């Protein structure tokens, strides 16, 4: 029999259901929008031109299928606050241990990259402010947001997300206005013919087209975060399906809509690779402070990602601590405890302290290169965790716990393996680009060695 949930109650693990439906729905919308769209759209367009839209749609489709798999399992057991628990449950403690620690470490390095980005954006306005001070201040502020109450986290994330959404909608509206008025630009006139004239599927060769997949894939990274938040809503079984079902339309509106608007305004061949297309477009319509505006938007986007990372790392570390009750270190640090507000506060604080190490890493000679390598490697490990999640879903569908009247993934026998193949394809793509090649090797070594160790440890 399925479990019933009521507003304001605690989950089985003691966490308070403090998030509201509007929080999760906006997190679901904004969670797919990272700084990459605002800053990296010019670079991705330079690789393959208008066919980048196909890359975004294909990648988005497979990420949606993964979310359907995660959503189906979370719908069956809404008390699970992390999808990693299903890997433990259906693939064994060895792979669960591997996934738990790998995911936490990957998120920590993601947090380090985000806090570094935050300081870079702030220094554009205050160049003499030391980066480490900026990082510590932002980390302390966002840690407090996560420690007060889950409702406070949801409210802050709601407004962070709103800023990103309004900016993209403003770009799309600007594009529609410029096309309908035949607006004159330095490259001619705004028109949809800028996209269709001389269209080629592979304008820079098929290798560049393939390389674009790994870049776009990581633009969607952490899309699974919405699944983590639903367990702390009042009605997870009501909120989760709606949040996941609307992912495709959000991808079309925000990613495809923004890219079409940019290419209609400005021929993609003439877009500056190292400058945000958003800045270029807004400056064209007379917004002189466009660069400052977009810097503010990407600052809030990076802060939003860091906020979500602290939320997620704290809950995953709390879960790891609960599953390793014999760990002397974790017991001493009380990482498996909750605050009076039902928050894994000690796990959040510990994760924040580890992320804070990045404030000092970048000032040490030679260490920053190693940090960049590890960060690149963690991205490859992310793919391995996604694959294990899909394998866990296959096992779930064959288990006695399968819920036929739940939020079922359609045609799973075909679409689940197809999604796994796509993730493997993206992993292979990491070896095709010089900037990700070494990281891909590092990820492969980690997956093999830590995977063997994790399974050996739990086979004794």
Predicted segments, located by residue:
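Extracellular loop-to-transmembrane helix junctions
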Residues: 16, 39-134, 138, 247-252, ...
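Membrane-interface loop-to-helix entry segments
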Residues: 119, 132-190, 217-221, 244-248, ...
